[in-house]
A protein has these predicted regions:
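Non-catalytic alpha-helical scaffolds and adjoining flexible linkers that form interface surfaces
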Residues: 1-21, 26-234
Length: 234
């Protein structure tokens, strides 16, 4: 029996039968893994309390199919303290990973970014900056990184002082007649996106708009539950 052990975070959990849970973990070395946690709902208090989101775990599991079996879960850190809107932001990050990651596809750099993002959401004065950085890293990891330097049609360099139109899954091109201004970005905003410089509030808003547009196609037009929770809490 092959046993694996990885650092991991819980992305999603749900009840299974009378005493167990189904878990989706984000593991440092192997990406997203689905497991059954037997007795996870009715075991000892220590066992039940271990399976908490936003806690770095050491996950040991076994199995050959798509659904593995938890052997043990051990908390390596305390739960990242998240309350109010910051909790909804962290739930949003988890939902993106749960929805978009392919099963058992390694993405070490993204794991580190995810861990840093949780800490930034909890502690930073402006957690929106961490969210935008995470979204851009996620797009790159999934193979949908955008060229922020060249016009996708002419090949010319994008310049400050001009406006450009964004085309999903492609990139930017010189602005044409368009009714939806939400897809228009200035050269200055695009350059700041490329450098991940969100110090300008207008750039931070533009980054939020861009990331939402870039992720929309990957999500298949299906709404995010965490986004609805966040909107309802305002």
């Amino acid at each position: 029996m092959s046993i694996e052990c990885h650092n991991a975070f819980i992305l999603h959990r749900r009840p299974y039968r009378e005493t167990s849970q189904l878990l989706d973990l984000f593991c440092q070395d192997v990406g997203k893994v689905s497991l059954i946690f037997k007795g996870g709902r009715s075991g000892t208090r220590m066992r039940r309390g271990t399976a908490q989101p936003f806690t770095l775990l050491q996950a040991t599991y076994f199995g050959r199919g798509q659904l593995k079996t938890v052997k043990s879960l051990e908390a390596k850190t305390q739960v990242v303290p998240l309350v109010g809107n910051r909790l909804y932001m962290a739930m949003y990050v988890n939902e993106l990973l749960y929805r978009l990651l392919q099963a058992e596809t390694a993405c070490d750099g993204l794991f580190n970014t995810y861990q840093d993002t949780l800490i930034s959401i909890a502690r930073d004065e402006c957690p929106q900056t961490a969210l935008r950085n995470f979204e851009l890293t996620l797009l790159e990891t999934l193979g949908y990184g955008v060229n922020f330097e060249q016009d996708i049609y002419s090949g010319e360099l994008l310049e400050c002082g001009f406006e450009y139109q964004y085309q999903q899954q492609a990139g930017f091109f010189a602005k044409q007649a368009i009714h939806n201004k939400q897809h228009i970005y200035t050269g200055e905003q695009i350059q700041a996106l490329s450098e991940r410089d969100f110090s300008n509030p207008e750039v931070l808003l533009a980054a939020k708009r861009f990331c939402r547009q870039a992720l929309a196609h990957l999500l298949g037009g299906k709404p995010l539950h965490s986004r609805a929770l966040f909107s309802g809490a305002k």
